Amino acid sequence: MSVEEKVKKIIMDQLGVSAEEVKPEASFVEDLGADSLDLTELIMAMEEEFGTEIDDDDAQKILKVKDAIDYIAGKQ
């Protein structure tokens, strides 16, 4: 499973959204209905899945699906 596929699966599991909704340009808050707690849990799930730490400054820049995929891919 690719980084993109894993990130999308985490997003679907954490936010309870469908694969069709998880588009690269989808905003977690505006398009996928996430709140601040959802975003925190999403970051924690990605950290656990990929064995990396996402610092708070970087986490605040992860606003869209593509941001998360690009960030994690850059850490691999």
Curated annotation (Swiss-Prot):
Entry PTM: 4'-phosphopantetheine is transferred from CoA to a specific serine of apo-ACP by AcpS. This modification is essential for activity because fatty acids are bound in thioester linkage to the sulfhydryl of the prosthetic group.
Compartments, as annotated in UniProt: Cytoplasm
Keyword DNA repair set for record: no
GO MF term list: acyl binding; acyl carrier activity
Transmembrane regions: none
Ranges for domain Carrier: 1-76
Recorded GO CC terms: cytosol; membrane
GO biological process, one term: lipid A biosynthetic process
Pathway: Lipid metabolism; fatty acid biosynthesis
Pfam families attached to this UniProt entry: PP-binding (PF00550)
InterPro entries: ACP, ACP-like_sf, PP-bd_ACP, Ppantetheine_attach_site
Keywords: Cytoplasm, Fatty acid biosynthesis, Fatty acid metabolism, Lipid biosynthesis, Lipid metabolism, Phosphopantetheine, Phosphoprotein
Superkingdom per UniProt: Bacteria
Modified residues (O-(pantetheine 4'-phosphoryl)serine): S36
Keyword rRNA processing: no
Entry similarity comment: Belongs to the acyl carrier protein (ACP) family.
Job description of the protein: Carrier of the growing fatty acid chain in fatty acid biosynthesis.
Name of this chain's protein: Acyl carrier protein
Organism: Oleidesulfovibrio alaskensis (strain ATCC BAA-1058 / DSM 17464 / G20)
